Amino acid sequence: MSEDTTEPLVGPSTLWKDLRALLPDTEEELKLDLSEKVDRSMATLLRQALGLFYEGRWQKCLQASEAVLDYSWEKLNTGPWRDVDKEWRRVYSFGCLLKTLCLCQAPQKATAVAEALRVCDMGLLMGAAILGDILLKVATVLQTHLLPRKQPACGPHQDQPATKKAKHDASSTPDVVLDREVPRLRCPPLQHFKKHFLVPGRPVILEGVADHWPCMKKWSLQYIQEIAGCRTVPVEVGSRYTDEDWSQTLMTVNEFIHKYILSEAKDVGYLAQHQLFDQIPELKQDISIPDYCCLGNGEEEEITINAWFGPQGTISPLHQDPQQNFLVQVLGRKYIRLYSPQESEAVYPHETHILHNTSQVDVENPDLEKFPKFTEAPFLSCILSPGDTLFIPAKYWHYVRSLDLSFSVSFWWS
């Protein structure tokens, strides 16, 4: 936690008033609507916690909400995540909501609000939507009331932090051969893109698509810390997700930046494939969905928007995704190599089901004795720079390495 969170909180009574306004006036108006999949004892405990809240018995409510969280946490961590019933995720969200509110009932310092925001984020990350996405609204109120953080200046026109991870390293920048370079077009008409790239499944870099996005001028380390620094996010730790020592952990964006970007950490940290813009709508206001997504079959709400934020040297191993992808580069540069789905045999996918969409080959240092066909497989490559939008067709194999401190936004669509 950064030092400024110990400062006295400004207007705690205003904070409580703003939070309380998000809830119904009476307990009877707040509907839990839990299904029979939730144990009767847990449903009873949650209703008791709710009653304690509306009676103003904050300490008792806090204890009850923590009991709800402990029990539902066990349910969330039993078996594969895909098998966790949504009802238990809703129970967890209710527990997070009540604990968050109790922590903010009479906070004396901003540390209490920062802890409340951490709990709220846990509900957003691990729970399911309740009461019209109330946790999103609570998080927005909490952020508004936290004092502005004092971060070192690091704007887009200033030098980035002087660490090895933030400097350009010419020796680490691969050569892109002209006849193997991804083609570039500047804002082609929709039908031209559809006919020549979408339908035949050909990669292309679209220039100018993101020029008008506010993030292209606003985003910097300082800005990201100011908007999202106190938010809890999942971070991948390790060089590649295929490595045995790879893991995931939860930390605030500030902690991530200080540990993995501003410092020389032993491991590589990567805020990867996270729906950050659903968690923090303030950042979503700085981006737009590319117009070309309208050529898809799905609705706009079905487009998955992910953030990819990390230091120089983060790697996404050669893999393929089932959906069309627009990868927009906002900060820094990335080296990307692409192989057609027709070359699947030559990239040697893992044989296990969980990694069947990932190649066994280390793209930039291949073991050709073990994978002899790989060197013969044709590919395209590029250096993706700020403002570039790369179209990666569905099931196209792609390998990504960041050459600088980097922030990318991906749009997966059908």
Swiss-Prot record:
Compartment annotation: Nucleus; Chromosome
Superkingdom classification of source: Eukaryota
Entry EC no(s): 1.14.11.73, 3.4.-.-
GO molecular function: aminopeptidase activity; chromatin binding; endopeptidase activity; histone H3K36 demethylase activity; metal ion binding; methylated histone binding; p53 binding; peptidyl-arginine 3-dioxygenase activity
Domain JmjC: start-end pairs: 269-414
GO biological process: circadian regulation of gene expression; fibroblast proliferation; G2/M transition of mitotic cell cycle; in utero embryonic development; negative regulation of DNA-templated transcription; positive regulation of DNA-templated transcription; protein destabilization; proteolysis
Any one Gene Ontology cellular component term annotated for this protein: chromosome
UniProt keyword annotations, A-Z: Aminopeptidase, Biological rhythms, Cell cycle, Chromatin regulator, Chromosome, Dioxygenase, Hydrolase, Iron, Metal-binding, Nucleus, Oxidoreductase, Protease, Transcription, Transcription regulation
Required co-factors: Fe(2+)
Protein's UniProt keywords contain Nuclease: no
Binding site for Fe cation: 319, 321, 398
Cofactor: how bound: Binds 1 Fe(2+) ion per subunit.
InterPro entries: ARM_KDM8_N, Cupin_8, JmjC_dom
Reactions listed under catalytic activity: L-arginyl-[protein] + 2-oxoglutarate + O2 = (3R)-3-hydroxy-L-arginyl-[protein] + succinate + CO2
Major subcellular location class: nucleus
Summary of the function given for this chain in its UniProt record: Bifunctional enzyme that acts both as an endopeptidase and 2-oxoglutarate-dependent monooxygenase. Endopeptidase that cleaves histones N-terminal tails at the carboxyl side of methylated arginine or lysine residues, to generate 'tailless nucleosomes', which may trigger transcription elongation. Preferentially recognizes and cleaves monomethylated and dimethylated arginine residues of histones H2, H3 and H4. After initial cleavage, continues to digest histones tails via its aminopeptidase activity.
Protein name: Bifunctional peptidase and arginyl-hydroxylase JMJD5
Organism: Rattus norvegicus
Gene label: Kdm8
